[in-house]
């Protein structure tokens, strides 16, 4: 299954970072879209702090962020498995 392949690769990167004394707070996986099965498998994974972000959502969030009052992106907005575009844009425009 596609998630197991992606998961193995991400865990490999995570282990490499840890060996170099780097701390990983969150892994953001960006893709054009995610299947329901992929999202389900991601939700069941307890080893990585992984969030899924579609490329179109990332682009929209970036455009709103550029016009927001924030100098640094509030990372707490990336707490979901599947990133909620509307919630983040609403928070950035407050």
Question: Could you describe each region identified by the protein language model?
Answer:
Residues 1-93:
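Catalytic core segments in nucleotide and nucleic-acid processing enzymes
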């Amino acid at each position: 299954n596609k998630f197991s392949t992606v998961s193995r690769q991400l865990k490999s990167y995570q282990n490499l970072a840890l060996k170099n004394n780097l701390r990983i707070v969150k892994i953001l996986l960006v893709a054009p879209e995610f299947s329901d099965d992929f999202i389900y498998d991601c939700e069941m994974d307890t080893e990585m702090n992984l969030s899924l972000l579609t490329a179109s959502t990332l682009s929209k969030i970036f455009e709103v962020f550029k016009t927001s009052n924030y100098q640094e992106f509030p990372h707490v907005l990336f707490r979901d498995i599947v990133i909620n575009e509307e919630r983040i844009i609403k928070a950035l425009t407050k």
